Amino acid sequence: MISDKTLRVFLAYKKDTKDVGKFPTVNFLRDYLRSENVEIVTDYKDIESCDVILLVTLKLFSKVRGAAKEFNKKIIAIPFGDHANFKKKKNELILTNIKSLNQVDLICVETKGQMEFLKKSSVVTPISISWFSKPMNQRTSISSLEKTTFNKYFGISNDSHSIIVLGCTDSFKKAQSLARMAPGVTFVFVDISSVFLKHRWITEKIPNLYYEIGMRDELYPSGIASASAVVILERWFMDMIVILDAIASNVPILAVDIPLVGTEIQAGTDFIATEESPVGIYESLQDLKHNPISDAASSDLLAKIKNDENHKFIDVIKNEIVSPKEEK
């Protein structure tokens, strides 16, 4: 471990004003580093004075590679911090810039599903499960209806279950209906639309329904791992990363009016396509192999992350700095 001197980290990510708000992982990463008293550097001419390079936008690898070699700096990649690192092809999510990703020193991922995705993409660089240790309740979500703790959002106890519902503004009413039909289950509705709900639009407070804004990155890893099920209400949100995280954690997926998009979904998890009505969704939830509605006492779904994998991200950075850099 290095000394307690202030770390200087070069953060390589795409700074495009029209994309502000799309990459909450980048925003969270900046907040996290600052909370650990890390100095963030973004000017390329100052790379020499930095301790390590964090590569978020993969296509910027060519801009930092030369300086990393010249000044003997390690490059740690965080590929899931930028949606621009991926593209969709025939309903599958494809990783771009694989060649550059295989030339960095370390790749940090947040979930086992992300790790499996990289392995399937033929990424051979050493991979580390490196959790951002800052809890959910310390993250700022200005559009949430209310500020709740991490446990209230995604916590699972022996007598309750939580179901993550992915949808857009128009499908929020379905989530409300589901919450009314299953009062003993906590529903977390994640709004993935571009036009978000306003506080005044929600006229009824449902105790077991929470509202959150965000794309994939807003689903804190332990949220997927500890959920009883993931319900996808929008056909265009068949995000393979979310699916892989659910598969890795043995969490069933319920998809509304969505055709088969890949054999890996069928092979890896309990996947059911259902009709669009709230009643149909409710009945399909009861049909899952592990029933999150009636089987509330079951612990089979609680795929918890092992303590020895809960590495603090800042310590991963420090350990990489003191390790000798090998030529690639």
Where are these regions (language model features)?
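Membrane-proximal helix-turn-helix segments that form the acceptor-binding/catalytic region
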Residues: K90-I107
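A short, active-site helix/loop in glycosyltransferases that binds the activated sugar's phosphate group
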Residues: Q103-P126
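Conserved donor-binding/catalytic core segment of Leloir-type glycosyltransferases
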Residues: S157-K173, V188
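Nucleotide-activated donor-binding/catalytic signature segment of Leloir-type glycosyltransferases, i.e.
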Residues: K198-R216
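Aromatic "clamp/platform" in nucleotide-sugar-dependent glycosyltransferases that forms part
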Residues: E234-W236
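Short hydrophobic beta-strand element within catalytic cores of glycosyltransferases
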Residues: P252-A255
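Conserved acidic donor-binding segment of nucleotide-sugar-dependent glycosyltransferases
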Residues: D270-V279, D287-P292
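C-terminal alpha-helical cap of glycosyltransferases
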Residues: S284-N291, K304-K328
